[in-house]
Regions:
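Single-stranded nucleic acid-binding surfaces, predominantly the OB-fold ssDNA-binding core
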Residues: 1-128
Length: 128
């Protein structure tokens, strides 16, 4: 197993596809779009850079939770990069995917209900 661990922060770019394998395990696969950002010193504004699309695979219980994600959800994925070979147009290709160990939904860009320290709902907040 390749132990190149990485953290990917981005948006889910395809709805997850989940399937149960013959041995009973669940596997969920989806893609994440991660866009770099740089601060333009002259204008003081953030500018989007290149977008990288990565396949993410989750297994077992994490796969069942990842199946609830939807296109556009902001996620933070921690996992290992895995290289694999596959056949395409009569030849062999190399692909890469992130084998997820943890997946978190980024709440800063999502409408969420928050709770005060007393447990009462404090309202909703939306950030972009």
């Amino acid at each position: 197993m390749n132990l190149a661990q990485l953290i990917v922060v981005g948006n889910v770019s395809t709805d997850p596809g989940t399937r149960q394998l013959p041995d009973g395990r669940y596997r969920t696969r989806f893609r994440v779009a991660a866009t770099s950002r740089t601060l333009d010193a002259s204008s003081g504004r953030w500018r989007d850079g290149e977008t990288t699309f990565l396949a993410v695979v989750a297994w077992r219980g994490l796969a069942e939770l990842a199946a609830r994600l939807r296109t556009g959800d902001r996620v933070i994925v921690v996992g290992h990069l895995r290289q694999y070979d596959y056949a395409r147009d009569g030849g062999r290709e190399i692909g890469y995917e992130v084998q997820a160990q943890e997946i978190a939904v980024g709440l800063a860009s999502r409408r969420t209900a928050t709770r005060s320290s007393h447990g009462a709902a404090a309202g909703t907040e939306s950030r972009a």
